[in-house]
Amino acid sequence: VKNHMMGICGSDKSFYRGFMPPQTAEFRQPPEFPFLLGHESGGTVVAVGSRVSDYKVGDQVMAFGWNNNFADYFKSKAFQLQPVPEGLDMDIAALGEPTACAMYSGLNTGVQLGDTVVVMGGGYAGQIIAQCSKLKGAYQVIVVDVLEGKLNLAKSLGADVVINSKEEDPVAKVKALTGGKGA
């Protein structure tokens, strides 16, 4: 796949620092060395293996793979790709993996009408999870972060309360907001 654009995930930063993931459901494959970072990208198929029937040269795809996308070209198994919907800009398509993860998390957390939800971190995924929580009927969505810009964005996107954990104790604040019940 010829890369169009790639994102830098928090896990990429951890891997770069030498922290490898545990063998869990998310990370089924042990890393192979040399270990190339990157798993958030989108691009165009430039070659296919003889047993591949799902994709052809020229198809635009989003990568949902384990690693190796920090390159102009990368190799992927067919199951680690998803076709880009017709008309979707490739700059947006490259965000397919983190968007899908955040949407899945946000929509499958068991949030119910009237719940209070605390989202720890106002990054890309946290913003999406906060919005999904509101859509699922959460009464109160609280976003905690240390960066004012992320907190301001969360507030503008519908968070009810934002907490800067550099300035306030989030546990004490959540308890105060919920009459000691918590979230």
Residue ranges and their predicted role:
Residues 1-7, 21-67, 85:
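Glycine-rich beta-strand-centered segment in the early N-terminal region that forms part
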Residues 11-17:
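Cytochrome P450 core scaffold surrounding the K-helix E-X-X-R motif
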Residues 26-27, 80-90, 177:
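Glycine/charged-rich beta-loop-alpha catalytic/anionic-binding loops adjacent to active sites
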Residues 65-78:
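A structural motif shared across PLP-dependent enzymes of the aminotransferase-like
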Residues 89-168, 172:
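Mid-domain Rossmann-like dinucleotide-binding core that forms the NAD(H)/NADP(H) cofactor-binding site
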Residues 177-183:
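A glycine-rich helix->loop->beta "capping" turn
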